[in-house]
Amino acid sequence: MAGKKLPSCLKKRDLLNSDRVDNSELIKLGQNYLQEGFISDCIDFFEKAEHFEGLIQLKEKCAAEGDYFLYHRLAKILRDSPSPEEWNQLGDKALGLGKLLFARLAYERADNHEKAAQVEKLLQLPLEERTSGGKGLH
């Protein structure tokens, strides 16, 4: 850790289940988790604090990182329904980063059956063939 003390899992649970914690403290803790790379924990604190600006920024970060699961979680929290184009962009990003499962799930959300099927074929290949650089979607 880079000097930020994060609460224990029990303290985190207590903070997230308390009605007596100030939103500014929750946001600060969320920022600390984010700085340490714990995005899911950051989401927990931002959601509790109803820090929608921070949640929107995290959604953009997750899209840029091709992270299907956190992006989907944030879309639910924000009551957002990403368009097929947004899901396709997430799928393309995930695919480019080698996150094949995330790519397939994003393409399925976009109803892009062709790309989802192509990624599924890649998932069936032995790992060495997936990462050799010679195989992939073009």
Model-predicted segments: where are they?
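Extended alpha-helical solenoid/arm regions of large eukaryotic scaffolding proteins
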Residues: 1-138
